[in-house]
């Protein structure tokens, strides 16, 4: 299994991740929405999400991050906007959430609503975002798979677990996972987080806290201190070798179908990334709809809508049926460590 550690730390250049069919890139506008939590429309709930925020990060205020529309996503210092789905990481000392949000995602509906003033209607979903901050927050998420809530039921799902795969079914089931029946792919019954490519010595609880720190089941069983310690350890991890990250040669035949935004040159160490410049005449409504349809199309079967978000690369390029058959992301070729179902709005 190809391992991945958060090597960006808190002193490298920002990277914005787009939850769509494009490879990891900086954006200048709002794209197809990714995996968004409805409860994070509440500013108070966004503040609560920062319970596991690594203390080794720069002194960024969770209050300021939440006010700017961000909630904690993890691993490391990754945050996501509840409205546009934009993800930012690698925060530097002196960064201001509002400034970075506007720099990388200037077309965010939440930002646009702030400029229009309270009570303005959001043009994307027709809701009044100004009223959402007063919405009663969802204190606890219901399990995605309630039928797997019992540990013994989860353990029973491992009856066909491959004998040559590392990992104890008892420990995996105790950590909230059940077996999907595909190779070594397991899922959390509560947060729907999926993990695969297990290695000898991997601890299910630690991996759960590393990749899905906002899982309510994880929080209830292990507590904030455990999750925070796991997230803190990511910043002290050594730089990953090229071999551990896997090949990042892009499949141009696949990438060509997701060319809605040009891919900027990768920044050199210490260089500050700037958002790409958009050129050319604006697209018509019909062209925008066609492009959005192409973005949402599974890049493997070219039939169903994309619905599975790969971890750690963050690409959303395949449907639920095609995802279990892949071991590497078809866009960046990075080893797939886990996956999460993405709900498209």
UniProtKB/Swiss-Prot annotation:
Q: Which GO terms describe its cellular component?
A: cytoplasm; nucleus
Q: Where are the zinc fingers (RING-type)?
A: 298-333
Indicate the principal place this protein occupies in or around the cell: cytoplasm
Q: Per UniProt, which keywords does this protein have?
A: Apoptosis, Cytoplasm, Developmental protein, Metal-binding, Phosphoprotein, Protease inhibitor, Repeat, Thiol protease inhibitor, Transferase, Ubl conjugation, Ubl conjugation pathway, Zinc, Zinc-finger
What the entry lists under PROSITE patterns is as follows: BIR_REPEAT_1, BIR_REPEAT_2, ZF_RING_2
Q: Where does Zn(2+) bind?
A: 188, 191, 208, 215
**GO-annotated biological processes:** apoptotic process; negative regulation of apoptotic process; positive regulation of protein ubiquitination; protein autoubiquitination; regulation of cell cycle
Q: Which is an annotated GO molecular function term of this record?
A: cysteine-type endopeptidase inhibitor activity
Function of the molecule: Weak apoptotic suppressor. Has E3 ubiquitin-protein ligase activity. Weak inhibitor of caspase activity.
The name of this protein is: Baculoviral IAP repeat-containing protein 7-B
């Amino acid at each position: 299994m190809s391992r991945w550690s958060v090597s960006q730390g808190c002193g490298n250049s920002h990277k914005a991740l787009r939850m769509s069919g494009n490879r990891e890139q900086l954006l200048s506008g709002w794209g197809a929405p990714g995996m968004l939590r409805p409860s994070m429309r509440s500013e108070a709930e966004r503040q609560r999400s920062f319970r596991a925020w690594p203390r080794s990060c720069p002194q960024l205020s969770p209050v300021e991050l939440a006010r700017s529309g961000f909630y904690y996503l993890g691993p490391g210092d990754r945050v996501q906007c509840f409205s546009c789905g934009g993800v930012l990481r690698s925060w530097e000392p002196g960064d201001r959430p509002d400034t970075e949000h506007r720099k990388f995602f200037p077309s965010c509906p939440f930002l646009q609503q702030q400029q229009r003033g309270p009570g303005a209607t959001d043009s994307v979903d027709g809701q009044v975002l100004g009223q959402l901050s007063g919405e009663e927050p969802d204190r606890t998420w219901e399990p995605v798979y309630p039928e797997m809530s019992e540990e013994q039921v989860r353990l029973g799902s491992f009856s066909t677990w491959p004998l040559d795969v590392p990992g104890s079914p008892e420990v995996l089931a105790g950590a909230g996972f059940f077996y999907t029946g595909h190779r070594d792919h397991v899922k959390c019954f509560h947060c729907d987080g999926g993990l695969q490519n297990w290695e000898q010595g991997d601890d299910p609880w630690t991996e759960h806290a590393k990749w899905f720190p906002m899982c309510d089941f994880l929080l209830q069983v292990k507590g904030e201190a455990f999750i925070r310690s796991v997230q803190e350890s990511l910043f002290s991890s050594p730089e990953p070798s090229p071999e551990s990250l896997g090949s990042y040669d892009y499949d141009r035949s696949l990438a060509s179908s997701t060319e809605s935004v040009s891919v900027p040159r990768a920044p050199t160490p210490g260089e500050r990334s700037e958002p790409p410049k958009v050129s050319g005449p604006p697209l018509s409504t019909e062209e925008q709809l066609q492009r959005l349809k192409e973005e949402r199309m599974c890049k493997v079967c070219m039939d169903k809508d994309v619905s599975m978000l790969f971890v750690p690369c963050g690409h959303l390029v395949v449907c639920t049926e095609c995802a279990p058959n892949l071991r590497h992301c078809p866009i960046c070729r990075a080893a797939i460590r886990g996956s999460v179902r993405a709900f498209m709005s």
